[in-house]
């Protein structure tokens, strides 16, 4: 049974360390910039998934994001959002076609009305997903290696699949820009597709997308570059990375 230690059991904190930490945090409420966007403070709400029907924004989502913005954070990261309709399911929000833009607009407006920014997080789940929306379409991954979480064995992506994916991300990012988002973030962590390419556990490829760390990072970097060409030099494009394979 876990027992919380009493205060007497905790090592004393040096006053020098305590006040040094406070001095480092004093800028939390200061205005700053992240690329082209202005942050009214240093508080950023991390991405948490939203469960919705058919990938469309719900009224409950709009209410939640507005409440988060009213709470005072400078920037909110959306829940992960799919760029490929074949990965649709499990209530994940979507931006793989223009039909989703109108649903995002009132959510964006509600966040902006509270003087906050909103970034759309984009993802491809790869074999980190249980089943494709179209059963005739295979799950895609870096290599045909069983997924530790789902047990599914994906089809190793061809160069055509890779080019298609990069374009899907670029098109979704442009939709985000046109909808009014302040930027996008590529989800390259937590066992999803970009992460599957970056780790040697899943990536057993012998082509330009496998082997060295530079090669395993190539898909993420090239996707960023493809997005950048589509959205222009000033639109923020962030990347969420993971430092370990777990």
Predicted segments with their positions:
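Active-site-proximal loop/turn and secondary-structure-junction residues that shape catalytic pockets
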Residues: 49, 82, 124-126, 188-190, ...
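Short beta-strand segments at enzyme active-site cores
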Residues: 76-79, 118-122, 179-193, 234-241
């Amino acid at each position: 049974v876990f027992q919380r230690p009493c205060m007497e059991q905790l090592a004393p904190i040096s006053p020098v360390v305590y006040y040094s930490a406070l001095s480092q945090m004093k800028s939390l409420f200061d205005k700053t910039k992240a690329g082209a966007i202005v942050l009214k403070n240093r508080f950023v709400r991390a991405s948490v998934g939203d469960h919705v029907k058919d990938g469309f924004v719900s009224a409950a989502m709009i209410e939640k994001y507005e409440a988060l913005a009213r709470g005072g954070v400078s920037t909110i990261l959306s829940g992960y959002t799919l760029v490929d309709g074949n990965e649709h399911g499990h209530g994940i929000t979507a931006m793989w076609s223009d039909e989703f833009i109108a649903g995002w607009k009132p959510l964006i407006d509600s966040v902006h009305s509270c003087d906050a920014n909103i970034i759309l997080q984009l993802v491809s789940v790869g074999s980190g997903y249980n089943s494709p929306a179209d059963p005739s379409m295979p799950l895609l991954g870096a290599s045909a290696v069983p997924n530790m979480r789902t047990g599914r064995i994906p089809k190793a992506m061809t160069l055509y699949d890779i080019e298609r994916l990069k374009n899907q991300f670029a098109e979704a990012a442009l939709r985000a820009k046109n909808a009014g988002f302040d930027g996008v973030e590529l989800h390259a962590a937590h066992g999803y597709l970009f992460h599957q390419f970056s780790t040697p556990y899943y990536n057993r490829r012998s082509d330009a997308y496998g082997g060295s760390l530079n090669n395993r990072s190539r898909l993420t970097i090239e996707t960023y570059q493809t997005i950048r060409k589509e959205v222009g030099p000033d639109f923020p494009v962030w990347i969420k990375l993971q430092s370990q394979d777990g």
